[in-house]
């Protein structure tokens, strides 16, 4: 009997994100991100998002494990473990500190050049997320973040920059990490702050629509730069169980999951499924399809 197993080219590895390990939050021209205003928490204390970076407050992303300065020894350890791939992300604010600049920050671009070269030296395939639970805080303050359609253009410019720069070093890309988490935690991934009296779901789903457009544009753009790119998007899998077998509970659990899973339908098919259109209509949510 033939033994089943993983193929020799299976990408075995591990995953992190820039805001989780790089530190150096304001080094070499990097600007503040939404992750940089998230305070530390504890078992009995939830993390908070402050209005900008405050003195004397502990922000885990500011130092992290100082991967920015120690990546060579860390990648060497991964190579020693036999990693075939390493998923991490590019910090948007290392490349465009405020998010809306026309020219990128060369120091940030060079860091990722060096990081990817180090990975490839050990035969480790970089798997890169373009936006992983962070975005320029400058875009939050100036534009209201992803609620503004102009964010699509800023993101596309960012994608064009990194796709072009790393087209011969990175093959595997993800446009967003867990793009559907915006429905649960709107600030960290999308920079959404609510005004008094707003229909929060209206804001969330309009911002999500902008991110979906940006994700689609990134795929088209990436393949125009390098047809061999493998580009996808990471989604959160929030499973909801019905409390009882009562049909009302079962339908409520299905609707709860549909609010997250429709992102998959849009990515795969290019349009909103009918169940989501009905949900939006029932809740007086009008998406500007532009």
Would you name each region that the model predicts?
Residues 1-50, 54-55, 99-100, 109-290:
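Active-site region of glycoside hydrolase catalytic domains
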Residues 56-69, 147-149:
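Active-site mouth loops of central-metabolism enzymes
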Residues 62-65, 69, 103, 202, ...:
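Short, solvent-exposed segments of well-ordered alpha helices
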Residues 63-76, 108:
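Internal amphipathic alpha-helical repeat/solenoid segments
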Residues 70-91, 125:
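Catalytic domains of carbohydrate-active enzymes, especially glycoside hydrolases
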Residues 84, 93-95, 133-135:
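A short acidic, glycine/proline-enriched capping/turn motif at secondary-structure boundaries
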Residues 90-104:
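Glycine-rich, proline-tolerant flexible connector loops at the mouths of alpha/beta enzymes
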């Amino acid at each position: 009997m033939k033994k089943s197993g993983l193929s020799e080219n299976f990408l075995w590895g591990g995953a992190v994100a820039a805001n989780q390990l790089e530190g150096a939050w304001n080094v070499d021209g990097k600007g503040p991100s939404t992750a940089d205003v998230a305070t530390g928490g504890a078992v009995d204390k939830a993390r908070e998002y402050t209005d900008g970076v405050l003195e004397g407050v502990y922000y885990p992303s500011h130092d992290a494990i100082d991967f920015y300065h120690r990546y060579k020894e860390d990648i060497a350890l991964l190579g020693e473990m036999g990693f075939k791939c390493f998923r991490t992300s590019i910090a948007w604010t290392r490349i465009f500190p405020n998010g809306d600049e026309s020219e990128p920050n060369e120091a940030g671009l060079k860091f990722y050049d060096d990081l990817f070269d180090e990975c490839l030296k050990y035969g480790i395939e970089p798997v890169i997320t373009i936006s992983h639970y962070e975005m320029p805080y400058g875009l939050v303050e100036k534009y209201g973040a992803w609620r503004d359609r102009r964010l699509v253009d800023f993101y596309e410019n960012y994608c064009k920059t990194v796709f072009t720069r790393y087209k011969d070093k990175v093959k595997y890309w993800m446009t967003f990490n867990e793009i559907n988490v915006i429905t649960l935690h709107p600030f960290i991934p999308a920079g959404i702050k609510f005004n008094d009296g707003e229909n929060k779901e209206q804001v969330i789903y309009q911002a999500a629509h902008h991110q979906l457009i940006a994700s689609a544009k990134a795929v088209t753009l990436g393949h125009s730069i390098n047809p061999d790119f493998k580009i996808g998007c990471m989604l959160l899998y929030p499973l909801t169980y019905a409390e009882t077998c009562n049909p009302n509970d079962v339908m409520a659990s299905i609707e709860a999951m549909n609010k997250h899973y429709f992102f998959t339908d849009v990515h795969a098919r290019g349009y909103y499924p009918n169940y989501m259109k009905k949900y939006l209509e029932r809740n007086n949510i009008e998406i500007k399809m532009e």
